[in-house]
């Protein structure tokens, strides 16, 4: 899965389609007539057999009066032999080669909102009817079909994308009916899944119209879920972070709100989403918080889900830092936080979380005494931090933990203590705090037996056998097909993450907990009851592409309170 999945373009294919669409969109703002690094090259009017107004860099201008400020680029991608493989159509957003073009675009934006019925839907035909007919004939002569065409654009350009998609079945001989459509920051959204509408939740232009209809919410916060749109991506900029600035209403009439709209901010933030290790865990309606803070703000502003001017966010939260030094903060729910480059500081208020520090010296600020946590090192680069309520944070590339310990005046005042992460334990000055006891396997099949209550068993790679007759043991089989035996008391935890394989558990009890973290296709809200099956006396729980067999357990023995999906 992935937040930019579109039709059959899933995972890596969805990423590639997004990248092509963004490259075309950015080119439309700064056309040069020169080939792009991504392989796209402008196709000129002469080659298309088109007669109309064309700019010096090959930009096509609107054909009818009232639409002459509209601009579109037509590009092609070729193989090494020079054969045309695909065509890209990129609508430019508001702003052109002069004041008159910009004013014309503003007029079209206004008419799309409050003008005649159908103005937005018919925009592409009114502006470029003859051009799109020429492109269709040219493409067919080259052996291409509509499936070989990608249409993109930002802002007013996104409106053009949605317009072309809506008209595609009944115009230009239906050639564009099967084209691919990816729009950024579009004020409109076509019906169904014909277009992937990508935008920031706090962009006042994105989804400003309900479909193509202006309504009461258009001038204020407009966060209605749209079927074709990414609905919960937040551009975390200075305006979004400011309590003072948010005393003014979120509105397309508020100039401060427009900080989330620029195409450069789209490229910078969304490219980090695509590059993220968490990408395959996201979906179209995932809550994504993307920092676009300036360098001056990063060291004093916590990036977190403020859920401002929006419908309540649901499910896990994904937070993406910059390549600078960020302050990144999760909430009480389940969070996936990625620091990337720089010396980042992480906080979290509970739940089941995955924190990836990235490069630099990164710190996890516990905000409480170290004694309220148990910390385990799996010997393979992951530090597990369990809080007093049972929540678990899996962390990588964290160089230190910071705790808040009693200070002077009989503990009335607290002090921060930094504990460096070492192979032996957590080192604060000359004081070493041992990690919670664990047994760590390797990349091959291991047989591990718990030796103390509260033990952790890490199988890592290979097909492992993990056994325990102790209580409150945490089993982490890792990759491979693992078998786990539990005959002790207490509440044991069976933790699965990533591509964990096909595992079996013997001795599962109702007091135990099954925890699935970072398993593609099985995030928070996963309805496990739809993925249970019984085989003889056993229960099979399918989770994403993998499964756990609970030996000797009936399906009705499981309850939602004993299973965590994060």
Q: How should these model regions be labeled?
A:
Residues 293-366, 371-393, 401-504, 528-530, ...:
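Glycine- and aspartate-rich repeat motifs characteristic of hemolysin/RTX-like Ca2+-binding segments
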Residues 1-43:
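N-terminal low-complexity, Ser/Thr- and acidic-residue-enriched intrinsically disordered segments
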Residues 549-553:
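Short, exposed beta-strand-loop hairpins at the edges of beta-sheets
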Residues 2-3, 84-86, 123, 133-150, ...:
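Serine hydrolase/lipase
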Residues 365, 513-517:
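Surface-exposed beta-strand/loop patches in extracellular or lumenal glycoproteins
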Residues 153-157, 161:
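Gly/Ala-rich beta-loop-alpha elbow adjacent to hydrolase catalytic centers
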């Amino acid at each position: 899965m992935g937040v930019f999945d579109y039709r059959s373009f899933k995972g890596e294919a969805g990423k590639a389609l997004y990248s092509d669409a963004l490259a075309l969109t950015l080119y439309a703002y700064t056309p040069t007539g020169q080939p792009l690094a991504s392989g796209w090259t402008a196709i000129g009017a002469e080659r298309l057999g088109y007669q109309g107004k064309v700019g010096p860099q090959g930009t096509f201008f609107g054909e009818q009066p009232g639409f002459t400020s509209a601009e579109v680029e037509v590009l092609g991608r070729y193989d090494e032999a020079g054969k045309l493989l695909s065509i890209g159509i990129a609508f430019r957003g508001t702003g052109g080669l002069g004041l008159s073009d910009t004013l014309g675009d503003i007029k079209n934006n206004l008419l799309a909102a409050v003008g005649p019925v159908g103005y937005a839907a018919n925009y592409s035909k009114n502006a470029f009817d003859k051009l799109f007919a020429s492109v269709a004939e040219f493409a067919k002569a080259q052996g291409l079909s509509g499936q070989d065409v990608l249409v993109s654009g930002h802002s007013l350009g996104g409106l053009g994308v949605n317009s072309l998609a809506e008209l595609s079945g009944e115009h230009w001989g239906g050639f564009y009916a099967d084209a691919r459509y990816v729009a950024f920051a579009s004020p409109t959204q076509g019906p169904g899944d014909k277009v992937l509408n990508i935008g920031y939740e706090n962009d006042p232009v994105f989804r400003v119209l309900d479909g193509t209809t202006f309504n009461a919410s258009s001038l204020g916060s407009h966060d209605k879920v749209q079927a074709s749109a990414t609905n919960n991506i937040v551009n975390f900029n200075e305006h979004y972070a400011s309590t003072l600035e948010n005393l003014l209403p979120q509105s397309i009439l508020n100039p401060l709100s427009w900080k989330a709209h620029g195409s450069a901010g789209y490229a910078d933030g969304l490219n980090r989403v695509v590059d993220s290790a968490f990408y395959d865990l996201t979906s179209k309606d995932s809550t994504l918080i993307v920092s676009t803070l300036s360098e001056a703000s990063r060291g004093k502003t916590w990036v977190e889900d403020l859920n401002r001017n929006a419908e309540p966010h649901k499910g896990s939260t994904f937070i993406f830092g910059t390549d600078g030094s960020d302050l990144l903060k999760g909430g009480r729910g389940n969070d996936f936080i990625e620091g990337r480059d720089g010396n980042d500081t992480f906080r979290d208020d509970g739940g089941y979380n995955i924190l990836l520090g990235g490069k630099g010296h990164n710190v996890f600020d516990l905000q409480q005494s170290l004694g309220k946590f148990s910390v385990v090192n799996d010997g393979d680069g992951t530090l597990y931090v369990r809080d007093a309520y049972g929540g678990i944070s899996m962390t990588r590339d964290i160089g230190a933990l910071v705790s808040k310990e009693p200070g002077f005046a009989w503990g009335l005042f607290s002090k921060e203590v930094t504990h460096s992460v070492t192979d032996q334990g957590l080192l604060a000055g000359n004081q070493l705090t041992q990690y919670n006891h664990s047994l760590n396997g390797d990349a091959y099949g291991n047989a591990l037996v718990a030796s103390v209550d509260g033990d952790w068993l890490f199988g890592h790679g290979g097909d492992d056998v993990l056994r325990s007759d102790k209580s409150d043991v945490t089993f982490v089989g890792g990759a491979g097909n693992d078998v786990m035996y539990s005959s002790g008391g207490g509440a044991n935890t069976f933790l699965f993450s990533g591509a964990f394989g096909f595992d079996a558990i013997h001795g599962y009890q109702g007091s135990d907990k099954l925890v699935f973290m970072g398993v593609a296709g099985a995030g928070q809200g996963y309805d496990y009851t739809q993925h249970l099956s019984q085989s003889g006396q056993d229960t099979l729980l399918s989770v994403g592409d993998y499964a756990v067999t609970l030996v000797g357990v009936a399906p009705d023995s499981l309850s939602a309170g004993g299973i965590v999906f994060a």
